[in-house]
């Protein structure tokens, strides 16, 4: 695992794999408005007028050069990563059709990446329907992940399709794409003709971690994922190690929630905690040794900043795997508006990372205004300080008095985690009821 693609700039320094870069700083202070300095807005146009005008130009101009098309796409994406771009009522069907045409055709890397990002962003803004877009793009995304010549395109396809799959919330599809990602890890990228490409392998770890947050039932997929991720802890790349470690922590977190304690009176004992994961990680002791080494890595070849990130992340990963029932391991939070958003689980952290990757500086605005985004991150409160009259917001104005800080709702991190567990159980029950209904209809007709 030593090859680096020097031409690929998959993420900026602020969007790297580690938890710290995404959660540090003041996400609530990120600019989500002014674009005059970047030359995006012209004259007296508002951002929405400029967005609609650019979309119209892209749709209506039949003969447009690749360079001009790239400029239009870049302008659309820049606006969408500074504002909650939900109010595009006209030309939605035409825009989706055009983006799919660009996506499926032979394009430059930049044009293709911009198109992928825009499609994901409009799904997050509920402009496009996730299920429809996922169905229309599945084949192409898989082809790009397997056969694209550019590592950047492979990485983009892996990350963005994993996000669409997570948003789709279909466990069968999650496992199917997850198995593909596992094959990438097991072969160090060779299965997609990217052997020892740390970018591709790192993205596969990151994407697999995201998909693991969607798993709600027992399957062999969990053990296969754990084995593949454990092997990547020995990778030469710190980014790969971090992505693999966080994904492993998310896996243990999910297993701990899926499997009820065999003996609740003794659920704090080392014996019960260990036996609970025996079939997932047969050699758990060796895994813990590896994690302790990473949590205290002192090699001079690693920069001071990287070493700090490595230590902090792997201390949390180690505690999650060593003491699955421990409380308050993760104490990350971000400030959005006047609300404190607790990211106190690996599920929330990995999902926030992927949203931050696609949405950039508009993450906080999308979170504040979109119930869909807040639900995806497991946030049950409202965002204080947001005007109920904002036309972009999907809040019910009748509940304006309930825009309160989640931290003040009286829920401890333990209570929030228990609430998530109840929701997962209800989700599984709903899936069973739906499956039973479909089977009853099918068999009644045959």
Swiss-Prot record:
It is found in: Cytoplasm. Its main location: cytoplasm. Residues 411-431 are annotated as: Disordered. Pfam families: IFRD. The keyword Cytoplasm applies. GO terms for cellular component: cytosol; nucleus. Keywords: Cytoplasm, Phosphoprotein. It comes from the Eukaryota. The modification Phosphoserine is found at residues 393, 397. PANTHER family: INTERFERON-RELATED DEVELOPMENTAL REGULATOR, INTERFERON-RELATED DEVELOPMENTAL REGULATOR 1. Belongs to the IFRD family. This is Uncharacterized protein C20F10.03. It comes from Schizosaccharomyces pombe (strain 972 / ATCC 24843) (Fission yeast).
């Amino acid at each position: 695992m030593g090859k680096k693609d020097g031409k690929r700039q998959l993420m900026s320094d602020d969007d790297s794999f580690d938890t710290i870069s995404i959660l540090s700083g003041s996400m609530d202070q990120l600019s989500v408005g002014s674009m005059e300095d970047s030359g995006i807005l012209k004259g007296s146009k508002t951002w929405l007028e400029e967005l609609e005008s650019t979309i119209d130009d892209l749709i209506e101009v039949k003969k447009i050069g690749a360079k001009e098309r790239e400029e239009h796409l870049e302008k659309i994406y820049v606006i969408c990563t500074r504002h909650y771009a939900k109010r595009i009522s006209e030309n939605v069907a035409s825009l989706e059709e055009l983006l799919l045409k660009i996506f499926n055709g032979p394009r430059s890397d930049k044009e293709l990446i911009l198109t992928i990002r825009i499609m994901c962003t409009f799904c997050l803004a509920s402009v496009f329907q996730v299920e429809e877009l996922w169905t229309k793009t599945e084949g192409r995304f898989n082809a790009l992940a397997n056969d694209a010549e550019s590592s950047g395109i492979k990485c983009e396809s892996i990350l963005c399709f994993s996000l669409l799959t997570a948003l789709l919330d279909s466990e069968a599809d999650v496992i199917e794409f997850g198995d593909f990602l596992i094959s990438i890890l097991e072969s160090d990228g060779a299965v997609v003709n990217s052997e020892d490409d740390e970018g591709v392998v790192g993205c596969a770890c990151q994407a697999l971690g995201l998909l693991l947050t969607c798993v709600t039932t027992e399957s062999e997929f969990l053990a296969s994922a754990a084995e593949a991720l454990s092997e990547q802890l020995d990778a030469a790349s710190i980014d790969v190690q971090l992505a693999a470690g966080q994904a492993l922590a998310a896996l243990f977190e999910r297993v701990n929630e899926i499997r009820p304690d065999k003996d609740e009176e003794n659920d704090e004992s080392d014996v019960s905690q260990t036996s609970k994961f025996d079939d997932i990680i047969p050699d758990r002791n060796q895994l813990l040794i590896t994690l302790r080494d990473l949590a205290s890595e002192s090699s001079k070849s690693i920069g001071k900043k990287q070493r700090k990130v490595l230590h902090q992340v792997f201390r949390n990963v180690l505690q999650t795997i060593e003491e699955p029932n421990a409380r308050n391991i993760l104490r990350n939070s971000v400030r959005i508006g006047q609300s404190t958003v607790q990211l106190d689980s690996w599920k929330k952290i990995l999902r926030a990372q992927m949203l931050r990757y696609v949405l950039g500086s508009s993450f906080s605005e999308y979170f504040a205004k979109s119930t869909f985004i807040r639900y995806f991150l497991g946030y049950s409160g409202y965002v204080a300080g947001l005007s109920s009259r904002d036309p972009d917001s999907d809040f019910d104005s009748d509940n304006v008095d309930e825009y309160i800080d989640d931290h003040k709702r009286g829920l401890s991190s333990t209570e929030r985690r228990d609430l998530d567990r109840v929701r997962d159980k209800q989700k599984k029950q709903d899936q069973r009821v739906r499956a039973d209904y479909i089977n009853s209809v099918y068999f009644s007709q045959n």
